[in-house]
């Protein structure tokens, strides 16, 4: 799966939270200043090309919906970050969190318990 831009992620969050949407509904949900219809339509079609959304036709218009779950995207994104910044090592990623004090001892214990349960 290809990585998403910030704007694409913003639109995907709308699909994950609200379900199927028409482009007009997407625009209504966005903050001011509202982007032009064609801009959002182009971004949504790009998401469809990338496989993140699909559509159902209603006459001349389309209602779009997420074809990839938020959890699935999160896993893919995490894998990409670990690969790109930590040499594909989840140990290096977690070690970085520990060194930066971004993860607590209790959270580490939970991780260990999860790993032990997987065995």
Segment roles from a protein language model:
Residues 9-14, 25:
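Pre-recognition alpha-helix immediately N-terminal to the DNA-recognition helix
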Residues 13-19, 98:
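Short, locally clustered residues in the helix-turn-helix/winged-helix DNA-binding domain
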Residues 76-119:
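Amphipathic alpha-helical dimerization/coiled-coil segments
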Residues 4-7, 58-77:
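Short, cationic-aromatic polyanion-contact patches
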Residues 2-7, 20, 87:
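Short helix-coil-helix linker/hinge
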Residues 51:
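Glycine-centered, phosphate/nucleic-acid-interacting loop/turn motifs that mediate DNA/RNA or nucleotide
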Residues 41-45:
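Short, hydrophobic-biased segments on the C-terminal half of alpha helices
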Residues 20-30:
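Short acidic, hydrophobic short linear motifs in intrinsically disordered regions
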């Amino acid at each position: 799966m290809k990585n998403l831009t910030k704007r694409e992620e913003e639109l995907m969050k709308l699909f994950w939270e609200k379900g199927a949407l028409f482009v007009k509904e997407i625009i209504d949900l966005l903050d001011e200043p509202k982007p032009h219809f064609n801009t959002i339509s182009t971004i949504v079609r790009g998401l469809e090309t990338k496989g993140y959304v699909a559509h159902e036709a209603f006459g001349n218009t389309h209602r779009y919906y997420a074809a990839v779950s938020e959890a699935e995207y999160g896993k893919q994104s995490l894998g990409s970050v670990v690969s790109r910044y930590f040499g594909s090592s989840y140990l290096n990623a977690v070690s970085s969190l520990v060194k930066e004090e971004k993860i607590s001892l209790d959270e580490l214990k939970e991780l260990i318990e999860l790993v032990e349960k997987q065995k």
